[in-house]
Amino acid sequence: MAAHLSYGRVNLNVLREAVRRELREFLDKCAGSKAIVWDEYLTGPFGLIAQYSLLKEHEVEKMFTLKGNRLPAADVKNIIFFVRPRLELMDIIAENVLSEDRRGPTRDFHILFVPRRSLLCEQRLKDLGVLGSFIHREEYSLDLIPFDGDLLSMESEGAFKECYLEGDQTSLYHAAKGLMTLQALYGTIPQIFGKGECARQVANMMIRMKREFTGSQNSIFPVFDNLLLLDRNVDLLTPLATQLTYEGLIDEIYGIQNSYVKLPPEKFAPKKQGDGGKDLPTEAKKLQLNSAEELYAEIRDKNFNAVGSVLSKKAKIISAAFEERHNAKTVGEIKQFVSQLPHMQAARGSLANHTSIAELIKDVTTSEDFFDKLTVEQEFMSGIDTDKVNNYIEDCIAQKHSLIKVLRLVCLQSVCNSGLKQKVLDYYKREILQTYGYEHILTLHNLEKAGLLKPQTGGRNNYPTIRKTLRLWMDDVNEQNPTDISYVYSGYAPLSVRLAQLLSRPGWRSIEEVLRILPGPHFEERQPLPTGLQKKRQPGENRVTLIFFLGGVTFAEIAALRFLSQLEDGGTEYVIATTKLMNGTSWIEALMEKPF
């Protein structure tokens, strides 16, 4: 059991156990010793549902990364390829299988497609003459992976680009399938709300799948009351801004991958007296970040400016607890102290780690450049000087700062102005291409197609109306003891989360005008429940809403939703699902065309 998945109103361990069971069943079909050949991208997500110990129990003796040419030598009966359905991976698999055949003792080959089998891929294997070599060709529907007690992700890195640039609906189909799996485990979700073109398509697919699913009527009492499907392009602004929560900043600066972060090792080296700092570790410090760690659960969603005081308070509590040993006089007292020692030592280690991380972040956030960048972002979001060329952006280009940093700022300005005046847009494009290279013209084209960097049409800026109606900018933010979701960006309230908040109370009818300005349709559907499964809510019992971000979600948005879940009179608790956990940098990166 993973305890951090079962603390919320919805026990996500049920989902984790279901996908683990499916994995065990597949491994047992391949009787005998096994080697797994991994599509490298899958190792992180798989690590969240099955550690090596589980694989070992089912006779997995070796694991390799999928690479061209020959497979490394392994004295096993079965070789299983775990791969995404990508054509380029089929070519590598064929190379592996063909070179293996020529090498002597025959082995059994199997292939597990994650999350779906693909006719195109199987045809490619057939064309390459190896399809017949596979005894088992199956799919493993790992659509939604539980990351935390209230968080699920498909970890589909290309979903936004596929949906909004390429018109490819594969990830939407996987999202609908994932929702079907959830409903099989947690009951039918009676009410569906949505905003955006992709949201509409996912709802349609899911309703169609439900109609076609002629199996026995789902008799599980519904855990979720509502499903809210939200397109990322309804709120393009939020991921572009710098997140200011503790977890958000860790992700902005170091990048969190599948719950792990890699950090500079020197901050974590034990300080020894008089060794002058020699023999410092050179390998990055890798830490897992989730709510299984008490301290992290407490500080992850706080504004970074509120983290220091929590850490110093914790330090006093921990040192006071260690001092207690001097007061232990009787055998019973000493035994009690010793029994608490492992927990205290873990708490001290956790505090040391997070103090080091906070120092690393502070080095960045107290720099002059961070302050200048944040000032410009906040001016844009509050509607100041969004319609002319910005001096700071000009300076960044002139000094050849990171291209992604420049693109995030230019896109933010464009979104906060409902597009840029043509001459401002042309100027930025020209400066970017001259400084960073003309090969980036394809990237600029992608950003325009995605609606991130575009000319203002009809000469009208709708952002001020949206900002005022949805109260997206709050001047008096309390970062220490927040009263509003805007604390996650020190003033800006994420548009996506404000939509969720308003849906919960007083309902979207109050903001019809703004919903019409934002892209895509908004809709409501009901899924009928069999008699006897209708929920009678107890007085004071909160509704549970599953909010699904199609195209990605940031840690700051997750923090804002957790804040709403914890409000005394909030009325709604949120479970968050997404196609990908992302930040502005990884988002822009996914839209960049790699120069040839």
From Swiss-Prot:
Residue ranges of coiled coil: none
The keyword Transport belongs to this UniProt entry's keyword annotation: yes
Gene that encodes the chain: VPS33A
Domain of life the protein comes from: Eukaryota
Bilayer topology annotation: Peripheral membrane protein
Protein name: Vacuolar protein sorting-associated protein 33A
GO cellular component: autophagosome; clathrin-coated vesicle; CORVET complex; early endosome; endosome membrane; HOPS complex; late endosome; late endosome membrane
GO biological process: one example: vesicle-mediated transport
Keyword flag Protein transport: yes
Subcellular location: Cytoplasmic vesicle; Late endosome membrane; Lysosome membrane; Early endosome
Pfam family, one: Sec1
Disease: Mucopolysaccharidosis-plus syndrome: A form of mucopolysaccharidosis, a group of lysosomal storage diseases characterized by defective degradation of glycosaminoglycans, resulting in their excessive accumulation and secretion. The diseases are progressive and often display a wide spectrum of clinical severity. MPSPS is an autosomal recessive form characterized by coarse facial features, dysostosis multiplex, hepatosplenomegaly, respiratory difficulties, intellectual disability, developmental delay, pyramidal signs, severe chronic anemia, renal involvement and cardiac defects.
Record key words, sorted: Autophagy, Cytoplasmic vesicle, Disease variant, Endosome, Lysosome, Membrane, Mucopolysaccharidosis, Protein transport, Transport
Function: Plays a role in vesicle-mediated protein trafficking to lysosomal compartments including the endocytic membrane transport and autophagic pathways. Believed to act as a core component of the putative HOPS and CORVET endosomal tethering complexes which are proposed to be involved in the Rab5-to-Rab7 endosome conversion probably implicating MON1A/B, and via binding SNAREs and SNARE complexes to mediate tethering and docking events during SNARE-mediated membrane fusion.
Organism: Homo sapiens (Human)
Subunit structure, as described in the record: Core component of at least two putative endosomal tethering complexes, the homotypic fusion and vacuole protein sorting (HOPS) complex and the class C core vacuole/endosome tethering (CORVET) complex. Their common core is composed of the class C Vps proteins VPS11, VPS16, VPS18 and VPS33A, which in HOPS further associates with VPS39 and VPS41 and in CORVET with VPS8 and TGFBRAP1. Interacts with RAB5C. Interacts with UVRAG, STX17, MON1A and MON1B. Interacts with VIPAS39; however, this interaction is debated. Associates with adaptor protein complex 3 (AP-3) and clathrin. Interacts with PLEKHM1.
Protein family membership: Belongs to the STXBP/unc-18/SEC1 family.
Predominant place of localization: cytoplasm
